[in-house]
């Protein structure tokens, strides 16, 4: 069974249950409590410290990204590079790529400018999805990268002129 079918099945069976959780490491939890107790003690901090999405939302975001890729002409077998930090949105983007039949090419978030360019060329990616943390590394090579590739920006803040904004 393809992994995208497993996502669809989990969506049908557990739609409103939590699928993914992101913990914000910049706001470390200092109390040894359960999440329910933590919410009772400090409701405003828990929301900032922890983000989550349900199976329904996960699947919806994956479908939305898959449809965007299809609208832009990405076909089965083409390659989509993913250059994002570990975040809640990473997996829906990954599954969106798989739903199109394209191949996901995860890039290491530690790559510098030259390594990103080398890997993008070596893997012959047709699309690069990147986050705000990588604008500085991509800017020097943006003209070369965007010449024959789609560039999708995902994140907060302004989207660079050489990319298309994709913020769900």
Please report, for each region that a protein language model flagged, where it lies by residue.
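Conserved AMP-binding/adenylate-forming core of the ANL superfamily
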Residues: 19-87, 91-94, 112-117, 167-168
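Structural core segment of the AMP-binding/adenylate-forming
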Residues: 5-7, 71-72, 99-167
């Amino acid at each position: 069974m393809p992994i995208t079918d497993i996502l669809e099945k989990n969506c049908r069976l557990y739609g409103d249950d939590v699928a993914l959780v992101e913990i914000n490491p910049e706001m470390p939890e200092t109390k040894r409590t359960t999440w329910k107790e933590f919410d009772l003690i400090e409701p405003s901090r828990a929301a900032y410290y922890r983000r989550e999405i349900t199976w329904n939302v996960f699947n919806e975001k994956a479908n939305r990204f898959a449809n965007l890729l299809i609208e832009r002409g990405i076909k089965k077998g083409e390659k989509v590079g993913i250059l994002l930090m570990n975040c809640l949105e990473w997996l829906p983007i990954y599954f969106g790529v798989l739903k199109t039949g394209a191949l996901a090419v995860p890039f290491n978030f530690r790559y510098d400018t030259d390594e990103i360019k080398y890997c993008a060329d070596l893997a012959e990616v047709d699309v690069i999805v990147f986050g705000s943390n990588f604008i500085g590394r991509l800017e020097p090579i943006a003209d070369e990268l965007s010449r024959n590739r789609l560039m999708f920006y995902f994140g907060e803040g302004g989207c660079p002129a050489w990319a298309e904004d994709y913020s769900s």
